[in-house]
């Protein structure tokens, strides 16, 4: 066969990237080169992180056989990270689930029984009985769902409708609670609207990049490649990296800063003080577009109310704040002097000054990037607010090349968890369940009785664990997440609740994960391009893809599972009589008819699909389900700053960044000439706030919930590595990625290892107040902790590091702090 130059270059690009990572990709390379003419290609966003890279998926004979970077994708411009090139292999692990499994003994469900193959009807029979019993005996607060930032947009929307409108339970929360909740609350407090104002185009125009708790070299490698290109092609560009340990992003850093855990709050306030003391405030911007407020302090640590730290807190969980003058704010940050900051953080003075000068220099366009180091923090919301302060003081915001930017870790943590509103307190388009007007808007749009959606905030992720353990949450369905491995404090909180005989646990997943094996019922699930989907990435870019292959065996999409299960319930079985009396025409109807097969959702005929286009759900139901759900959902944001384009536009485009008004996407929000919601002459308008002004918050340093002491003498931080994604449920089934990093290790400073008579390669027991794990000592490698801190990734199911972590959370966002707890080491 003939091979074009372009095809040859694509094939060699695959091999080159793999070689750089020390891997071989013979299967993928052969698929691209040797079968070029036989493969059918179609676009999709990558299945992994929140960057939102575009890929071209190659299918042949009903299987995904190849994947390459999409040269027309504006995010990655044809380049993938090493995980992206191995996307086909995540779908075909030898242990892929293809049929429901129920714990059974003597032909019946038994909590202590063995997993037994059953049919979908049998699975739904058991689920129906458990849900109806719980609802009848204990009410809507006894059921719950834990979802995902990996749900497609319409899966999250369908799940939220089923629980909040159908079952009348707000006990639905996404795993994004563990990673992005602090960013959400930070955005809402400062700007009144969620998500970043900038976009990836900032990278090519910035003069300085500051990474706060973000190892972009491994966690967002495609964006890091763009930053690297910007830095190496322009000698005036500066990169500063802040972390509690040294990692691969430090290799590019002009100013690599290692600080004591939790003391990032001190550094942020010091920089604000530096800006003021050096007359670097952008007075015109500041006077027109900013308000000042002093936040409540001593707010606790999101632990159980009986915990001593919660009892001691003066204002546990308080989000209160009060107006303050500029002079009072100036006095507040004045306490954070260079000397005090250096002492509290362990950072040399010259490094602190260099960092502060980047923000203070009016001629430097600065982007602040952060991820889990900021968000997984008992003061994560404060950290977000404090970095916004720096950009608001200097006016370095909402313009090309400068602004604060919270990066996401999941492909649709923004598009689904945040924008759709699958959090326990949220509704679509930044609306919340506690606001009567917001509930009314949803109830009218969904044509359900007024008062259907509960006003009470549901259980967040950690609260769900506690309620399961306490026997208050009795039926629990998790989808598209492996929380038994990923969530905190496994031994004390989560596992006891999952295995409590009072509770029934359902896990929907493509693979037998740690969570699945701890459940009572496992539902085999379709993944990625085995269904039609949509994700929303970190830069507000919504991206669609078509179903390209069918799932193996009887595996079904999360959307199919939700919609089909809703058929099992009639309104009178889930709603009280007073609600039914308000809309008697809904009496006798199933939740499927009320929520999904409505005139609003079912109005798009399946004939809109091409004859050869796969779409299992829509063809089974007889209408274009995904389009109907999306258009209904998109209605909530249109005209309110969250405008999404028409459904069909996304199948044609490589994603569009909202708000999309009159067919045009928005790159920079809140600034005149860039944002259609900012009128001529306004300059800037932070229209999420009633007065159009953003808020600078005065917030102090407060210590971590747990710190090293004489017995537990080391900090433990957890996180990820380049080769694996989250709990490794997909990447560890790729032989090449597994070989590259086969098991977790404990990264430790050589002197800390020597002091404990440990050498590289030794087995070591890592012990906290909550549990212990056996790991392997690593004194070299990519991560170099300072003395006093150890680092361990959480991808390894054989080394459950979250047996060690504490379930302390940010009291405002309820997000867990996975970065700070105390451990000791014992040689094995």
UniProtKB/Swiss-Prot annotation:
Binding of [4Fe-4S] cluster, residues: 46, 49, 53, 81
The positions annotated for binding Mo-bis(molybdopterin guanine dinucleotide) are 83, 150, 175, 179, 212-219, 243-247, 262-264, 372, 376, 482, 508-509, 531, 558, 718-727, 802, 819
Q: Which UniProt keywords apply?
A: 4Fe-4S, Electron transport, Iron, Iron-sulfur, Metal-binding, Molybdenum, Nitrate assimilation, Oxidoreductase, Periplasm, Signal, Transport
Q: Name one Pfam family in it.
A: Molydop_binding
InterPro entries membership = Asp_de-COase-like_dom_sf (IPR009010), CT_Nitrate-R-NapA-like (IPR041957), MoPterin_dinucl-bd_dom (IPR006657), Mopterin_OxRdtase (IPR006656), Mopterin_OxRdtase_4Fe-4S_dom (IPR006963), MopterinOxRdtase_cofactor_BS (IPR027467), Periplasm_NO3_reductase_lsu (IPR010051), Prok_molybdopt-oxidoreductase (IPR050123)
- GO CC aspect terms: membrane; nitrate reductase complex; periplasmic space
Q: Which cofactor does it need?
A: [4Fe-4S] cluster; Mo-bis(molybdopterin guanine dinucleotide)
How and how many cofactors are bound, per the record note?
Binds 1 [4Fe-4S] cluster. Binds 1 molybdenum-bis(molybdopterin guanine dinucleotide) (Mo-bis-MGD) cofactor per subunit.
GO terms of biological process kind: cellular respiration; Mo-molybdopterin cofactor biosynthetic process; nitrate assimilation
> Looking at the record's lineage, which domain of life comes first?
Bacteria
Look up the coiled coil feature and give its residue ranges: none
UniProt signal peptide: 1-31
**Single Gene Ontology MF annotation:** 4 iron, 4 sulfur cluster binding
Known role: Catalytic subunit of the periplasmic nitrate reductase complex NapAB. Receives electrons from NapB and catalyzes the reduction of nitrate to nitrite.
UniProt protein name? Periplasmic nitrate reductase
Q: Which organism is it from?
A: Shigella boydii serotype 4 (strain Sb227)
- Gene from which the chain derives: napA
């Amino acid at each position: 066969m003939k091979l074009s130059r372009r095809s040859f270059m694509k094939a060699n690009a695959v091999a080159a990237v793999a070689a750089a990572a020390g891997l071989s990709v013979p299967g993928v390379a052969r698929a691209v080169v040797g079968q070029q003419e036989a493969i059918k290609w179609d676009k999709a966003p990558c299945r992994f992180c929140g960057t939102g890279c575009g890929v071209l998926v190659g299918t042949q004979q009903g299987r995904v056989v190849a994947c390459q970077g999409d040269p027309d994708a504006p995010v990655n411009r044809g380049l993938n990270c090493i995980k992206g090139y191995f996307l086909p292999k995540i779908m075909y692990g030898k242990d892929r689930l293809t049929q429901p499994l129920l714990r059974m003994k003597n032909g019946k469900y038994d909590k202590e029984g063995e997993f037994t193959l059953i049919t979908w009807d049998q699975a739904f029979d058991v689920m129906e009985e458990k849900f109806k019993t719980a609802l009848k005996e204990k009410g809507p607060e006894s059921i719950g769902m834990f979802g995902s930032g990996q749900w497609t947009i319409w899966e999250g929307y369908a799940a939220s409708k089923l629980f909040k409108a159908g079952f009348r339970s707000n006990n639905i929360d996404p795993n994004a609670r563990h990673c992005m909740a602090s960013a959400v609350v930070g955005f809402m407090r400062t700007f009144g609207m969620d998500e970043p104002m900038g976009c990836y185009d900032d990278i090519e125009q910035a003069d300085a990049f500051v990474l706060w708790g973000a190892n972009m070299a491994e966690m967002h490698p495609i964006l890091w490649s763009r930053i690297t290109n910007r830095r190496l092609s322009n000698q005036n560009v500066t990169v500063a990296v802040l972390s509690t340990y040294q990692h691969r992003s430090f290799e590019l850093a002009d100013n690599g800063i290692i600080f004591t855990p939790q003391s990032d709050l001190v550094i942020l306030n010091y920089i604000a003080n530096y800006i003021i003391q050096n007359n670097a405030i952008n007075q015109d911007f500041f006077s027109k577009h900013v308000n000042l407020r002093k936040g409540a302090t001593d707010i606790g640590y999101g632990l159980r109310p009986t915990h001593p730290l919660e009892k001691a807190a003066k204002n546990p969980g308080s989000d209160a704040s009060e107006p303050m003058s500029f002079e009072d704010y100036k006095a507040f940050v004045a306490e954070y002097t260079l000397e005090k900051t250096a002492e509290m953080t362990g950072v040399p003075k010259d490094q602190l000054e260099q960092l502060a000068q980047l923000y203070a220099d009016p001629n430097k366009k600065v982007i602040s990037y952060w991820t889990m180091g900021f968000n997984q923090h008992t003061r994560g919301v404060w950290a977000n607010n404090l970095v916004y302060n720096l950009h608001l003081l200097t006016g370095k915001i909402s313009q090309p090349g400068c602004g604060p930017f919270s990066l996401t870790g999941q492909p649709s943590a923004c598009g689904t968890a945040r924008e759709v509103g699958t959090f326990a307190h949220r509704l679509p388009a930044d609306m919340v369940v506690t606001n009567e007007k917001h509930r009314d808007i949803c109830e009218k749009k969904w044509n359900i009785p007024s008062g259907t959606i509960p006003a009470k905030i549901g259980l967040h992720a950690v609260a769900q664990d506690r309620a399961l353990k306490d026997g208050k949450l009795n039926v629990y369905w998790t989808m598209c997440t492996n929380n038994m491995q990923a969530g905190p404090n496994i031994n004390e909180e989560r596992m006891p609740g999952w295995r409590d005989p009072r509770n029934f646990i359902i896990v929907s997943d493509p693979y037998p994960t740690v969570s699945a094996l701890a459940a009572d019922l496992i539902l085999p699930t379709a993944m990625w391009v085995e269904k039609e989907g949509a994700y929303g990435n970190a830069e507000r870019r919504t991206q669609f893809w078509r179903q390209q292959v069918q799932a193996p065996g009887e595996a079904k999409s999360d959307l199919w599972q939700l919609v089909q299960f809703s058929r099992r319930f009639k309104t009178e079985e889930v709603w009280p009589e007073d609600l039914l009396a308000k809309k008697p025409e809904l009496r006798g109807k199933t939740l499927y008819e009320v929520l999904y097969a409505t005139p609003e959702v079912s109005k798009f005929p399946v004939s809109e699909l091409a004859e050869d286009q796969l779409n299992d759900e829509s063809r089974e139901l007889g209408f274009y389900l995904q389009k109907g759900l999306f258009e209904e959902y998109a209605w909530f944001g249109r005209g309110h700053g969250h405008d999404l384009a028409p459904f069909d536009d996304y199948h044609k485009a490589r994603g569009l960044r909202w708000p999309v008004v009159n067919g045009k996407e928005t790159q920079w929000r809140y600034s005149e000439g860039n944002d259609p919601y900012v009128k001529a002459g306004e300059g800037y308008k932070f229209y999420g706030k009633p007065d159009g002004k953003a808020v600078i918050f005065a917030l102090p340093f407060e210590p971590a919930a747990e710190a090293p002491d004489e017995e537990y003498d080391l900090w433990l931080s957890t996180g990820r590595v380049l080769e694996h994604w989250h709990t490794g449920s997909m990447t560890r089934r790729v032989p090449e990625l597994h070989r590259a990093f086969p098991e977790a290790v404990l990264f430790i400073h050589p002197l800390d290892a020597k002091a404990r008579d440990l050498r590289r390669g030794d087995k070591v027991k890592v012990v906290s107040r909550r549990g212990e794990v056996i790991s392997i000592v690593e004194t070299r490698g990519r991560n170099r902790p300072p003395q006093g801190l150890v680092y361990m990734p959480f991808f390894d199911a054989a080394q459950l590091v979250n047996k060690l972590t504490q379930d302390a959370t940010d009291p405002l966002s309820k997000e867990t702090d996975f970065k700070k707890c105390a451990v000791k080491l014992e040689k094995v």
